[in-house]
């Protein structure tokens, strides 16, 4: 499949504020195309996660990948995480312990905004992968934050709604 870099849909576009719809055919060519476009675009824009609405697709899919970036002094080696695909994800648990940390977003990039957001330190999530196989994942630290941030996108929420 040819690499396609999508512009990141910005806040103000109605798809960013709409609740994304479930994917009905997880293994379709259309779903595979969305996953590939999300992955290529996330990597191109230097993001650690990207959700369907961020490329104008109002479907419940997001991808994450925490790669090494020498310009990011705050990223620990323990935070690195391979590419993960989440289709029709559902948060199934969240820790009581909350952690405040800085977030940014490709969908508010024009404003260069960052904000401090309090989120559970760890979460459990269930989703389907690109092969239609259901999986459960317990995430903590940066991956937990990225998952929650991307889940918010699927529900029409942007981090600035939660920032202090």
Predicted features and spans:
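Active-site rim/adjacent substrate-binding subdomains
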Residues: 1-148, 153-164
């Amino acid at each position: 499949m040819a690499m396609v870099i999508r512009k990141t849909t910005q806040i103000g576009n109605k798809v960013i504020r709409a609740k994304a719809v479930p994917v009905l055919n997880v293994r379709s060519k259309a779903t595979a195309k969305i996953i590939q476009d999300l992955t290529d675009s996330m990597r191109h824009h230097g993001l650690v996660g990207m959700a369907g609405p961020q490329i104008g697709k109002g479907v419940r899919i997001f991808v994450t990948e925490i790669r090494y970036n020498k310009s990011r002094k705050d990223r620990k080696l323990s935070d690195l995480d391979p590419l993960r695909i989440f289709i029709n994800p559902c948060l199934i648990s969240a820790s009581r312990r909350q952690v405040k940390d800085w977030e940014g977003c490709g969908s508010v990039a024009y404003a260069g905004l960052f904000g401090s957001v309090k989120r559970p330190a760890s979460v459990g999530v269930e989703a389907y992968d690109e092969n239609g196989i259901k999986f459960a994942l317990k995430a903590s630290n940066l991956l937990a934050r990225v998952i929650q941030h991307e889940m918010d996108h699927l529900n029409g929420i942007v981090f600035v709604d939660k920032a202090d």
